[in-house]
Amino acid sequence: MKTPFEKIRIISCILVIVSTNVVGQKCNGGANCIPLEECTDLFQQLKQGNSPQLTRLLRGLHCGFEDLNSPKICCPPEFLARRSAFSSAGTNSNPTSILPNEKVCGIQNNDRIFGGIQTEIDEHPWMALLRYDKPLGWGFYCGGVLIAPMYVLTAAHCVKGSDLPSSWQLSQVRLGEWNTSTETDCVEGDCSGPVQDIPVQQIIAHENYDPNDKDQQNDIALLRLSRNAQFNDFVSPICLPTSNELRQNEFESDYMEVAGWGKTETRSESDVKLKVRVPIVNREECANVYSNVDRRVTNKQICAGGLAGRDSCRGDSGGALMGQSPKANNWYVFGVVSYGPSPCGTEGWPGVYTRVGSFMDWILSKLEQ
């Protein structure tokens, strides 16, 4: 039960946050205008402490007052996920309602340094590390991205790949990490909160993925977490390309970004999250390159990189190829790191990524409340 002081503190905070907003705005994206306290996950985050990101979010969601002391907000469906889990079972009839909308997904607040190798402490807050338990310990050997409070997108080869030792068990996902060698990450007084280590409840690899397929078709998987991730400045979801425009875009002549710790099944490169900008490569050109080693690149894959030393070497196996929306600057995941040349970063040999847009129907079919 909340103490009177706690309730007054929360309500006072909200009144300050929303007082500049227009009351009575309509809700978009399947959200409902309800009292803040009924938007359970968001209310719990506010009780844990306010942040600039949470302030901006609440300002954008405010839609009126129940009474003088009860502000109402357009509660995004993802913040009702915990409550819904007890009232529904099985496949969700409207899976897109589980996905965060553009007021929540793909947003980062740092002043980014373009061309840098090391990320800022709160850059790409959707990046995830996959923890594997081994007979003699544990370690992080793949990556992924948070796409919803209870879902991480990764590569199928990270959960059933031919290089994955049978004695390893994927057990947890870590969110909110920046430097794996320190307990608390701080840069010039800006400190992240504690990391979120969340057990994996269910592993969902694409049914048509074959670990022994050298072309690595259908190399995509989802991880359902045992509980909701708590969104903050260092943990938030990336957007998925749900629109037909983004699903079908070839992105030729564009640059995208790969980030991660350089962790794969066979190497562990960096303690600190790294990034690199890579050019999108014409698929026909990419297919011609890989035909020299008898590998087939299809329209369900996307190629990027091919610059000496600047490939997905800095990304993680199962991590993301990311780009920003030209309309709203939100970040989207367009590719999942699948395979590339050996040695990594060989000039003229781009990395190959699973095209997320080609698997949106599959992703949506697997999402449950």
Curated annotation (Swiss-Prot):
Residues 25-81 form a propeptide. Residues 26-75 form the Clip domain. The keyword Transit peptide does not apply. InterPro entries: CLIP, CLIP_sf, Peptidase_S1_PA, Peptidase_S1_PA_chymotrypsin, Peptidase_S1A, Ser/Thr_Proteases_Immune/Dev, Trypsin_dom, TRYPSIN_HIS. In larvae, expressed in the fat body and hemocytes. Inhibited by (p-amidinophenyl) methanesulfonyl fluoride, p-nitrophenyl-p'-guanidinobenzoate, D-phenylalanyl-L-prolyl-L-arginyl chloromethane, leupeptin, antipain and to a lesser extent by antithrombin III. This is CLIP domain-containing serine protease HP8. It comes from Bombyx mori.
